[in-house]
Amino acid sequence: CKMSEQGLNAQMKAQIVDLHNXARQGVANGQ
């Protein structure tokens, strides 16, 4: 179960990073 938990955490972190990157790009483009 630990492996599956780590996999889910990795996916969640990847999604959060993508959201932050998009937000940063949006702010950079806006400015």
From Swiss-Prot:
Record's comment on post-translational modification: Contains 3 disulfide bonds.
Coiled coil start-end: none
One function term, GO molecular function aspect: toxin activity
Tissues/organs with expression: Expressed by the venom gland.
Keyword flag Disulfide bond: yes
Key words, A-Z: Disulfide bond, Neurotoxin, Secreted, Toxin
Top-level taxon in the UniProt lineage: Eukaryota
Main location: secreted
GO (cellular component) term, any one: extracellular region
NADP keyword on record: no
Compartments reported by the entry: Secreted
UniProt record similarity statement: Belongs to the CRISP family. Venom allergen 5-like subfamily.
Miscellaneous comment: Shows similarity with the venom allergen 5 from wasps. This similarity may explain why patients with allergies to centipede venom also display allergic reaction to wasp, honey bee and/or yellow jacket venom.
The protein, known as: Scolopendra 20566.01 Da toxin
Organism: Scolopendra angulata
Lineage: Eukaryota, Metazoa, Ecdysozoa, Arthropoda, Myriapoda
